[in-house]
């Protein structure tokens, strides 16, 4: 009897251990599945969220947590400047660029509004209480657009459609005349186009079914292809992007009085045909190739350089170097993530 009980005890013990191992393995597998699921959720594209007009307002690729993790791992200095340094601005540091998944825009082929899924962000500027982001359809089937966001909250407000499909590589705001300027082309020449902040605020595609109407279309014969524009000290600074050589930056003073108040035509006019005005820059300087953006901050001129999937760079020049913006003269160079556009 005792021998039987010993055998029974051993058998129960073995079964108990086996059950424990099985349960532990099952529990461990469950935890593994949960971790993998959480990892997949963490790295995958968030569920698509749309505004009332059908424009996507959710991130196009990753959620903010994953974005910050990747940024911290690959570009720790940029992460520190963005998220760990006391903020110098009340404008949000992390804003979702709308329309990356879908943007309703006029389809040139179908002659109606359809969903564009290839909008490529280009320029950005702060205009009054708004943050404006320009974008074009990389398939060239839809009108180019400007997304309008609340600059404090980053909330998407509306989309402004512009005439045609310009690249919209640059966008700037003149706070004196309250005009918004964008880069484009006119009759095979680079051009600057503008419309007022008041017109932007009133714009609604659903009301007139038309793109916004420009107040000024000004051709720039001295610029091969305008890729960036910025406002500084009552001037517009315009540059063109060149993939294999030196580029150029030209400054255009904005008239503050007279018949051409608020535009860059004043005494620079060479010829006027209808609404097309030809202007020559009052001052110009060479700039490094592959430049996508230019900004003035305190005593610095900052250029962004980007091309393809390689790291981008920010070049910091003293403002006295305006006539010699060669990368060798930069006092500071900061490595940034790829595809850096306007700054």
Each model region followed by its residue ranges:
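Sequence/structural signature of beta-propeller modules
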Residues: 2-111
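Surface loop/turn motifs at the tips and blade-to-blade linkers of beta-strand repeat domains
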Residues: 112-117, 160-164, 217-222, 282-287, ...
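Blade-loop segments of beta-propeller domains
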Residues: 118-121, 145, 154-177
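Conserved beta-strand position repeated once per blade in WD40 beta-propeller domains
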Residues: 120-123, 170, 226-228, 293, ...
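Residue-level detector of Asp-centered blade-edge/turn motifs that repeat once per structural unit
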Residues: 126-128, 173-177, 231-233, 296-298
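Short loop/turn segments immediately following the C-termini of beta-strands
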Residues: 136-138, 185-187, 240-244, 299, ...
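Structural motif
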Residues: 140-147, 188-199, 244-257, 309-320
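Loop/turn-rich, solvent-exposed surfaces of beta-rich toroidal or solenoidal domains
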Residues: 280-329, 334, 341
